[in-house]
Amino acid sequence: MLTKRIIPCLDVTAGRVVKGVNFVGLRDAGDPVEIARRYDSQGADELTFLDITATSDGRDLILHIIENVASQVFIPLTVGGGVRAVADVRRLLNAGADKVSMNSSAVANPDLVSDAAAYYGSQCIVVAIDAKQTEAGNWEVFTHGGRTATGMDVVEWAKEVAKRGAGEILLTSMNRDGSKDGFDLALTAAVSDAVSVPVIASGGVGNLQHLVDGITKGHADAVLAASIFHYGEYTVQEAKEYMAAQGVPVRI
């Protein structure tokens, strides 16, 4: 059985790491390079680095921060935010990213997923999906940092991007984001069971059992968290030891 990954997430705006609740109420969590270095030393399997206002503000990619982080960190780095074209993928890979995540731009132009995967390989293309539960009980895709409803069904969109060559899906529950109530396990399992590519569960981790549940009940291949690591509640090493004790295969 493949080992399951723990991925701390750095949401960045204006050059600082921040954390909010349900995509709003952002609170400063520190310097991205320092935080990335800390997670590397704690044994994180990967880091995800999202410029959360690049698309909604129409700003350019923050390449200098990515270069700084990549020069300090020797674990795989996924970078997203403001990716609008295949050329942006190249610029991020050249700056030191190992994988590039796209979200709003993939919804606006699904060919971007196919073209980027064909050119650079599926292994470095991640599609991030921000999902919100509707009153009907299914999940809708939102874009532009969770501000724009698309009317698209999350499970169908996940199947579409996997078919187009996305090597991985980063699935965030907007309802659970920052809530510390645990992953939306029904959402995570619905997407994980519908696609053959790895799914990263995101949104809602408040304790170490939530990480285990994301794998065992949500069928995710990796679990992503921010608050529990940024503010020192747990280290990545503690999370891995807990998961291993619960029978989840992790790299210690």
UniProtKB/Swiss-Prot annotation:
One Pfam family linked to the record: His_biosynth
First-listed, main subcellular location of the protein, grouped into a coarse class: cytoplasm
CDD domains: HisF
Subcellular location: Cytoplasm
Recorded metabolic or biological pathway in which this protein acts: Amino-acid biosynthesis; L-histidine biosynthesis; L-histidine from 5-phospho-alpha-D-ribose 1-diphosphate: step 5/9
Any one of the GO CC terms: cytoplasm
EC primary class: lyase
Catalytic function, reaction form: 5-[(5-phospho-1-deoxy-D-ribulos-1-ylimino)methylamino]-1-(5-phospho-beta-D-ribosyl)imidazole-4-carboxamide + L-glutamine = D-erythro-1-(imidazol-4-yl)glycerol 3-phosphate + 5-amino-1-(5-phospho-beta-D-ribosyl)imidazole-4-carboxamide + L-glutamate + H(+)
Gene Ontology terms: biological process: L-histidine biosynthetic process
HAMAP family: HisF
Family: Belongs to the HisA/HisF family.
Function recorded in the entry: IGPS catalyzes the conversion of PRFAR and glutamine to IGP, AICAR and glutamate. The HisF subunit catalyzes the cyclization activity that produces IGP and AICAR from PRFAR using the ammonia provided by the HisH subunit.
Protein name as it appears in the record: Imidazole glycerol phosphate synthase subunit HisF
Species name: Polynucleobacter asymbioticus (strain DSM 18221 / CIP 109841 / QLW-P1DMWA-1) (Polynucleobacter necessarius subsp. asymbioticus)
